[in-house]
């Protein structure tokens, strides 16, 4: 049901042209997305951040079935304490601190020992404190900075990915359940901006 906004012009300090219709935003259910078949070169790496949940393992196993090389990046235990056991096919890289130098050293080690990183998937943890969420966000910004060369090099010949996965309320943050840190919205801005910046 649309509301009549004709009297809105009288209540606002500016005039609204008569030919512009105003409406109320509401949530609309969308159909499930189709599957996009994407292949990563077998000589390239898919780096996934560990959110401490089964999702990390499920995603890694799904990509391995597609013959992707997967490495899991785990944050220090002070940020995400839970690290579920991985299968033999999955390598894990654990950050011992959150400095840019250490992250660069670890990424260089992955590239030198395994090949270029062609896909990065950040799985944002569901429940962390605001301080930890801010620390993770900062580190993902650093990750974007440090992966720029690798991802751009690969994109010259095939698709490369920088993906962030967040958990909201299923209603784009507009629902009643707000069991998430609002600072993680910075991930949306980061992924949106990378395409413009790179």
Regions found by a protein language model. Name each.
Residues 63, 195-198:
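A generic structural signal for well-ordered alpha-helical segments
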Residues 124-126, 136-139, 159-196:
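Catalytic loop of short-chain dehydrogenase/reductase
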Residues 1-142:
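Flexible, low-complexity flanking/linker segments at catalytic domain boundaries
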Residues 83-88, 155-157, 176:
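Intrinsically disordered, low-complexity coil segments
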């Amino acid at each position: 049901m649309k509301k009549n906004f004709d009297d809105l012009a009288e209540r606002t300090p500016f005039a609204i042209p008569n030919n512009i219709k105003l409406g109320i935003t509401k949530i609309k259910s969308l159909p499930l997305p189709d599957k996009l078949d994407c292949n990563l070169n077998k000589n390239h790496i898919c780096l996934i951040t560990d959110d401490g949940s089964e999702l990390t393992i499920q995603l890694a196993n799904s990509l391995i079935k597609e013959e992707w090389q997967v490495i899991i990046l785990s944050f220090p235990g002070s940020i995400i304490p839970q690290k579920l056991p991985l299968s033999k096919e999955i390598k894990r890289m654990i950050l011992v601190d959150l400095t840019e130098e250490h992250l660069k050293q670890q990424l260089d080690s992955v590239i030198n020992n395994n090949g270029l990183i062609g896909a990065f998937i950040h799985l944002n943890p569901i429940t962390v404190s605001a301080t930890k969420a801010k620390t993770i966000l900062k580190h993902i910004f650093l990750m974007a900075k440090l992966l720029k060369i690798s991802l751009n090099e690969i994109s010259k010949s095939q698709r490369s990915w920088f993906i962030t996965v967040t958990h909201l309320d299923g209603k784009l943050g507009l629902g009643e359940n707000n069991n998430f840190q609002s600072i993680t919205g910075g991930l949306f801005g980061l992924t949106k901006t990378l395409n413009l910046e790179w």
